[in-house]
Amino acid sequence: MPNQLPADSVGLVTPQTLHFSEPLELACGISLNEYDLVYETYGQLNAAKSNAVLICHALSGHHHAAGYHRLEDKRPGWWDAYIGPGKPIDTNKFFVVALNNLGGCHGSTGPRSINPATGNVWGADFPMLRVRDWVASQARLADALGIDTWAAIIGGSLGGMQVMRWSIQYPQRVRYAVVIASAMKLSAQNIAFNEAARKAIISDPNFHNGDYLAHNTLPKNGLAVARMIGHITYLSDYAMGEKFGRDLRSGSFELGIAEPVEFQIESYLRYQGDSFAVSFDANSYIRITKALDYFDLAREYSDDPVLAFQGAQAKFLVVSFSTDWRFAPQRSREIVDALVGANKAVTYAEIESKHGHDAFLLPDARYEQVFKRYLASVEV
């Protein structure tokens, strides 16, 4: 971190925890009798409580979206480029709420939490989740914060799925919906990538059918491979080629040299996998990717996406990125077509970017411009 906080930073922030004792019935039929949600806020809630913005995170995201926890932190929250004074999600204007979803591993109730019914860690017994469950818990968080209606709900990737679900599950509580690099349902290829990642986890001898904590071990190798698989899909071929090409980290192609060749991209992927394996939970990963797979916005509407959006009241911004092949621009155009068919107000932008799916997280002048101008139109 620099010697002083950047002028456009939200500054030092402290996570907060809310405990909920009213049971939450999940889509799977199981109820969580009590649970915690960890969240952060940036900016000030106005007297009318009309300026609140909810940030919905993606697979590996969490509540720390902006600012710093300590002056010693090496990097800010995961979306700091877009949240702060004068930034697209302007904290001089908006009161921003970011949370860690249920089933995660960054403080909200999840597989690593204690099951109050047994006194033991939930582990493999933690129930499977759906996107609608996250949205229901987020609505309860809004109630606890005194927020009847969100000025905007914003999310990328899996976060965008939550935004869409909000727009049809609680239509009267969302004024603007920003859906970034997302889809109304996963493709077969996406489901296949998720299953390959899960297979890597459950094949790790240290997984113990999900009860690894009871065995005082962690399936780090399996989780690392799962992250490597996922990370490949977040990058574009162009970006990988430009950054790494066929450059070597060690070894040589010269004849007569026995030392094994290691490419830079191999080293990079191993680093990403190993880092993730010590910061994330395998049971959380399995549940979150399953929620991704299960999501299908139109399923309960006779598979008609136009009908699914019929009751939505929000105005929409849909954003895609040209080299994103995990959630390709065509998937975003399908969202737009459904919204147009349902006669909803929608703005669409396809951003030229070389960074693939990860582009929604990274600084980009055009993306920032579109984002900023759209949110400037939101009246509070």
Swiss-Prot record:
GO cellular component, one term: cytoplasm
Enzymatic reactions: L-homoserine + succinyl-CoA = O-succinyl-L-homoserine + CoA
Subcellular location: Cytoplasm
Keywords: Acyltransferase, Amino-acid biosynthesis, Cytoplasm, Methionine biosynthesis, Transferase
Pathway: Amino-acid biosynthesis; L-methionine biosynthesis via de novo pathway; O-succinyl-L-homoserine from L-homoserine: step 1/1
Any one GO BP annotation for this protein: methionine biosynthetic process
Gene3D superfamilies attached to this UniProt entry: 1.10.1740.110, alpha/beta hydrolase (3.40.50.1820)
Main location: cytoplasm
EC number, as in UniProt: 2.3.1.46
Pfam family of the protein (one): Abhydrolase_1
Single GO MF descriptor: homoserine O-acetyltransferase activity
InterPro entries linked: AB_hydrolase_1, AB_hydrolase_fold, HAT_MetX-like
Positions of the record's site feature: Important for acyl-CoA specificity: 326
Active site residues according to the UniProt entry: 157, 324, 357
Domain AB hydrolase-1, chain residue ranges per copy: 51-362
Residues that coordinate or bind substrate: 227, 358
Function summary: Transfers a succinyl group from succinyl-CoA to L-homoserine, forming succinyl-L-homoserine.
Subunit comment: Homodimer.
Family membership: Belongs to the AB hydrolase superfamily. MetX family.
Record protein name field: Homoserine O-succinyltransferase
Species in which this protein is naturally found: Cellvibrio japonicus (strain Ueda107) (Pseudomonas fluorescens subsp. cellulosa)
Gene it is expressed from: metXS
